[in-house]
């Protein structure tokens, strides 16, 4: 109403236009994925087992999710806007930071120091993003399965 745009117009619902719509899509995707990560990690008390389980579950369901997904690809969005739209880049960064924090929190609960857990959370998110992109590109869940297996080995070597 405030924008005085016609009721059917995008500006009626999103006065700031496409940027507001994109930002809200980023935030909603972030919330849904964060909730999924939290539920997945809650499946195991041990962080290493939980993270492995989470990646394997993502692999098992990834192509079904891609075909039926209402969420946007945060990787695609962030690589598109990183140099052209600071508002959307920051929205993507905020979401990635939240996801990384979920992993870090799980690691802290398993006895890791806060700073090490923060760094590992970032590494885990990076590893998952890369494996997910490779799996889509190769039309195969093998990269996701390898990531899950190798993360398990890395954590086993830590203990």
PLM-predicted stretches and their roles:
Residues 1-24:
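Helix-turn-helix
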Residues 14, 76-83:
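Short helix-capping/turn signature of helix-turn-helix
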Residues 24-27, 37-70, 120-124:
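Hydrophobic alpha-helical connector segments
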Residues 45, 111-118:
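Short, charged helix-capping/linker segments at alpha-helix termini
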Residues 61-65, 83-84, 105, 125-142, ...:
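Amphipathic C-terminal alpha-helical segment
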Residues 75-76, 115-134, 150-153:
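Hydrophobic alpha-helical segments that form the core
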């Amino acid at each position: 109403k405030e924008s005085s745009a016609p009721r059917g117009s995008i500006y009626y619902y999103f006065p700031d236009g496409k940027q507001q719509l994109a930002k809200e899509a980023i935030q909603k995707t972030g919330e849904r994925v964060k909730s999924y990560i939290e539920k997945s990690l809650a499946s195991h008390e041990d962080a290493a087992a939980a993270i492995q389980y989470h990646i394997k579950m993502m692999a098992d369901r990834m192509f079904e999710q891609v075909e039926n997904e209402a969420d946007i690809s945060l990787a695609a969005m962030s690589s598109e806007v990183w140099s052209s739209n600071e508002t959307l880049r920051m929205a993507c960064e905020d979401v990635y930071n939240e996801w990384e924090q979920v992993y870090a929190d799980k690691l802290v609960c398993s006895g890791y120091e806060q700073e090490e857990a923060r760094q590992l959370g970032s590494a885990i998110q990076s590893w998952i993003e890369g494996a997910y992109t490779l799996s889509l590109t190769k039309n195969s869940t093998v990269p996701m399965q390898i990531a899950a297996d190798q993360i398990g080995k890395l954590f086993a070597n830590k203990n």
